[in-house]
Regions:
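N-terminal intrinsically disordered/low-complexity leader segments
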Residues: 1-10, 186, 193-198
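Basic, helix-initiating cap at the start of DNA-binding domains
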Residues: 1-39, 56-59
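Short hydrophobic clusters on alpha-helical segments that form packing/core surfaces
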Residues: 15-23, 69, 73, 95
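Short, hydrophobic secondary-structure boundary micro-motifs
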Residues: 32, 104-110, 117-120, 175-176, ...
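Short hydrophobic/aromatic patch on the recognition helix
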Residues: 40-51
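Hydrophobic alpha-helical connector segments
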Residues: 60, 74-102, 156
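Amphipathic alpha-helical packing segments from all-alpha helical-bundle domains
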Residues: 70, 103-107, 116-146, 150-157
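Amphipathic C-terminal alpha-helical segment
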Residues: 97-101, 138, 142, 157-176, ...
Length: 198
């Protein structure tokens, strides 16, 4: 990775970490760009240059959460070689546990309504779904699953869209939604991707 790209990625991570820290202390409605720039140790101008606006900052944070879903499912694929049901169950369970504890998600679900945050996971969700799905597609193509691009893309988009929908409406506490999702999606992989190798 070129130096400039690595420096930019580090800057974004530092800013998003700072936002997460602030959200552990107060609601999203009380967090300003000045607060974030101070906590991250960067100028407000740098913050605006990188994210464009407060909404852009929230989108960047949501995209990082979606990439954590991709990481959770990707890690689970490699931890459960030959067991797509186990991989999906583990990946969803890890993501749901992480998102339930995430300060931005907690802020979205508590206190006053936050339409600007809700837009990110509903109307404007393509900003999250498209890049996260692209990464997850590669995971399904380049792992033991070895799905075709078409099958991997269908599966990845479905996983990301379903998981993101649970951010705004968390899974029921008396139900193993991760298990349900694995049961729902595993047959697609077994019938399409894995059947081609049998």
């Amino acid at each position: 990775m070129p130096y400039a790209e690595a420096a930019r990625a580090l800057l974004r991570e530092s800013v998003l970490d700072a936002l997460g820290d602030l959200l552990r202390q107060r609601d999203w409605s009380a967090v300003t760009m000045s607060d974030v720039s101070r906590r991250a140790g960067v100028s407000r101008q740098t913050l605006y240059n990188e994210f464009g606006s407060r909404q852009g900052l929230a989108q960047g944070y949501a995209l990082r959460l979606a990439h954590r879903l991709v990481d959770a499912v990707g890690d689970a694929i490699y931890a459960h070689v030959g067991d797509i049901h186990g991989a999906l169950h583990s990946g969803f369970a890890d993501f749901f546990a992480e998102s339930a504890a995430d300060p931005m998600v907690i802020s979205l679900l508590t206190g006053e309504a936050k339409p600007e945050l809700m837009r990110i996971v509903t109307v404007d969700s393509a900003l999250i779904v498209v890049p996260a799905s692209a990464r997850l597609t590669e995971s399904f193509m380049n792992s033991w699953v070895a799905a075709s691009r078409e099958d991997a893309s269908i599966l990845a988009r479905s996983i990301v869209r379903l998981a993101i929908s649970y951010v705004s409406m968390p899974p029921e506490s008396d139900h193993d939604v991760a298990l349900d999702m694995a049961r729902l999606l595993s047959p697609f992989v077994e019938t399409n991707a894995l059947a081609d190798k049998a």
